[in-house]
């Protein structure tokens, strides 16, 4: 069953400066494509109203109607393999790909490559726990800041998905509670509840796709959206969770979808997360859309 088949790893040791630094897992994947999927126009009732059947936070309320224009979105989040191409093409060194705020963040923090990546003997590796992995797998690119994702988009001449578009495809064009229908999320439908302790290949969990074939919208990694985090119309502070949202309006960037270590009750297309655009330590990645002609 492809939902439970995982990449085979081969092991060898590597020495750096005459010291054993780790066991490398050499990933021998067949690289998959990441095609764009056409999404028709429609309407979305974005956000939530009070519902006793699930936990709802104040930043989801209240719902409002949005018209969605036709767009084309990547089937999967951008993979490690795809992002490696950006790195190899001097994406971190070419100022033309970086916005003003992104450039300031990159230079101030001396960002020269993705977090946890190492360049050894002209080969890129990624560290995770006690292992070092060859970079270039079908895993989703994660631990990536909004600024880095923005630079990738500029280099590739694509754009971020926006928050309304993301919720639209994650609710089957506004028709269901989840991409796969109305059933609650489980470990069989998406990578959640920390079952596998890390993200998995983007081509797994076919049964969790939406009806258009967009994959892994729930779980595995959070996904950056284009917008700054702002309240919905008629927002009212929930004083039980009063520190969750309003202190960060106008500062953080939206991210959606949950990740492998998020509980099922927070894995929902309406749930809004937000992080600083320079955040790299969270398991956040991104998917992209074609620019309108």
Language-model region placement:
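C-terminal catalytic core of Y-nucleophile DNA break-rejoin enzymes
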Residues: 66, 71
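Short, structured beta-strand segments at or near domain termini in extracellular proteins/domains
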Residues: 282-293
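Functional-site microenvironments in short loops/helix caps that host divalent-cation chemistry
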Residues: 1-61, 91-270
């Amino acid at each position: 069953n492809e939902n439970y088949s995982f990449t085979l790893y081969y092991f060898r040791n590597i020495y750096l400066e005459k010291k054993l630094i780790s066991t490398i897992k050499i990933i021998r994947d067949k690289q998959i494509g990441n095609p764009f999927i056409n999404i028709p126009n429609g309407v979305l009732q974005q956000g939530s109203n009070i519902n006793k059947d699930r936990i709802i936070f104040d930043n989801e309320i209240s719902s409002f109607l949005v018209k969605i224009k036709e767009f084309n979105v990547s089937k999967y989040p951008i993979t490690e393999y795809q992002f490696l191409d950006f790195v190899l093409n001097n994406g971190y060194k070419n100022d033309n790909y970086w916005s003003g705020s992104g450039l300031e963040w990159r230079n101030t923090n001396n960002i020269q490559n993705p977090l946890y990546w190492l360049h050894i003997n002209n080969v890129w590796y990624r560290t995770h726990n006690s292992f070092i992995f060859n970079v270039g797998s079908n895993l989703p690119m994660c631990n990536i800041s909004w600024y880095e994702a923005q630079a990738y988009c500029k280099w590739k001449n694509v754009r971020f998905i926006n928050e309304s578009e993301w919720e639209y495809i994650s609710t089957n064009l506004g028709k269901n509670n989840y991409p796969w229908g109305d059933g609650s999320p489980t470990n069989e439908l998406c990578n959640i509840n920390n079952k596998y302790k890390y993200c998995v290949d983007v081509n797994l969990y076919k049964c969790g796709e939406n009806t258009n074939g967009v994959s892994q919208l729930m779980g595995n990694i959070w996904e950056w959206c284009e917008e700054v985090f702002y309240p919905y119309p008629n927002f009212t502070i929930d004083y039980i969770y009063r520190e969750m949202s309003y202190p960060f309006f106008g500062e953080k960037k939206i991210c959606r979808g949950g990740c492998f270590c998020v509980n099922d009750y927070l894995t929902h297309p309406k749930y809004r997360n937000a992080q600083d655009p320079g955040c790299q330590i969270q398991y956040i990645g991104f998917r992209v859309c074609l620019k309108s002609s």
